Amino acid sequence: MNETEYFVVDTPGFEDEGGAWATFCEIAQLLDHIREHAVIVAIFFVTPINIFKRRPDPFEEKLYTWLREMSGERFMKYVTFVTTFWEAHNPDQLERYNDFLVRRKEQEWARFIKHGAQTYQFGKVYSAGVETTLHWDTDAEQLAAQAREMIRVYCHEIPIIQPLILHELNMNMGLGSTAAGQVLWPAGDGGTNDQGPSRAQSTASSGGSGRPRSTESPQSGAQASTTPTSPPTTQSTGDDPAAPGGWAWFREFAWEITKRYGPQIVEHVINRQFGSAGAIIGGNGGDFASSMQCMSAKGFDINSVTDTAKFFGKASDMGSRGPNGPIGNGPIIFSIKLQGSYFAQFLNRWQNEDIQAFDPKVDAVNDFMEQKDLFMETTVWNTHCQSWYKSRQTGKITALWPGSTLHYMETLAKPRYDDFDITYASKNRFAYLGNGFSQDELNPQADITYYIRDKDDGLSVFGNLFSTYNAKDIGDKMTALADRAI
């Protein structure tokens, strides 16, 4: 559609709770294989209407919970509940099917629909305002056409976000640790739930208790690369392998611990501690990883500044790739330093005041661009010269500052925070006030009465609020404060 290739994948169906985990493993393994090569544009949850009951049984309710955790709230708008087998033998049967559908929409599917999910009655048609149904045996061509139309209607948009399960797999989470995996994880299973899709599939299909077999290959992905496959062969002279207290015994014991818990340590400690697998979520709910997947699927180069700008619908010319600055009429090094200092003020406030996000207001951006364009009309740059900071198509001057270098410096000296929408990480914007102590007070080398002077020297009493000092060992420093009678 629209020169984009679409694939419809018919995944295994859920028959009963006993085989649910194995089915989920097959679906997850499929997603794991395609996640670097394609974008999920829709999820169709297909259920025959003729198996519905007045009230859903516990397994059906669990499947809805699984679907919710698998898609995630932000992807629910791309979920469609498709009901099939609408062929009814009499009006009463069709009315009963419609009652089942209404109940599902008002109760079990209500949360999905609230977040944008759709419903589709496959096989139901209207003729002259009368509701009728198609039959598999006699209306195959019409049903095929209806299926194609369903795909066209519900898959025309390529989302910038992806199902939650893909985010979790991108973070190298074990399948049983994912939100969806925790819903279907077999009750009473003592095995580890930190297996990847491929390994979990092998375990589930073995028919055992869910514990990994000793002959299984290492997990794929980042965890496999950090999981050794054979113990060290170096052995000290004189070690007795049979001696319980010998070094050889200790090395074997340590190696077993490494093989068993190494992947979990890497996933839950190292990756989480240093943030190497953390998702970057934008204000509209989209995340960076999904955007990059969408770019690749559309043929854009994720390493190209130009392609990135084009993908997000922005101007891709050279002058549109950075902030306006006086680099056409002033020293470039000075401009770069000013921009760095300006940015550092945002970082300082961001970390000190527990701020989650700064988002430039659209009106402020538009007002600045209007003022800049009016100024540029009066300058020499508005003549018929060509330069990298001037669009060849429109003639608009895109990258220069509407003023001199000192004018630029004075403007950036104090950020205009009122031109930004600020989102705080805490419900209370003043929660960052904390325990009432300044970080400078926790520095034993700091002059905490710097404001006492012999004469008025004209300097601000606020002092310099920038510091690389960090009071992480606050316990010791609080003790030092008590010793200094502060």
Curated annotation (Swiss-Prot):
Q: Where is the composition biased (Polar residues)?
A: 194-206
Cofactor binding note: Binds 1 FAD per subunit.
Q: What is its EC number?
A: 1.14.13.-
- Residue spans of biased composition, Low complexity class: 220-241
- Region annotated Disordered sits at 186-243
What cofactors does the UniProt entry give for this protein? FAD
Top EC class for this record: oxidoreductase
- UniProt entry keywords in alphabetical sequence: FAD, Flavoprotein, Monooxygenase, Oxidoreductase
GO MF terms listed in the record are: monooxygenase activity
Q: How does it assemble?
A: Homodimer.
Job of this protein: Probable FAD-binding monooxygenase; part of the gene cluster that mediates the biosynthesis of luteodienoside A, a glycosylated polyketide consisting of an unusual 1-O-beta-D-glucopyranosyl-myo-inositol (glucinol) ester of 3-hydroxy-2,2,4-trimethylocta-4,6-dienoic acid. The HR-PKS ltbA produces the trimethylated polyketide chain from acetyl-CoA, malonyl-CoA and S-adenosylmethionine (SAM), and the ltbA cAT domain then uses glucinol produced by the glycosyltransferase ltbB as an offloading substrate to release luteodienoside A.
State the family named in the UniProt similarity comment for this chain.
Belongs to the FAD-binding monooxygenase family.
State what protein this is by name. Answer: Probable FAD-binding monooxygenase ltbD
In its UniProt entry, the species of origin is given as: Aspergillus luteorubrus
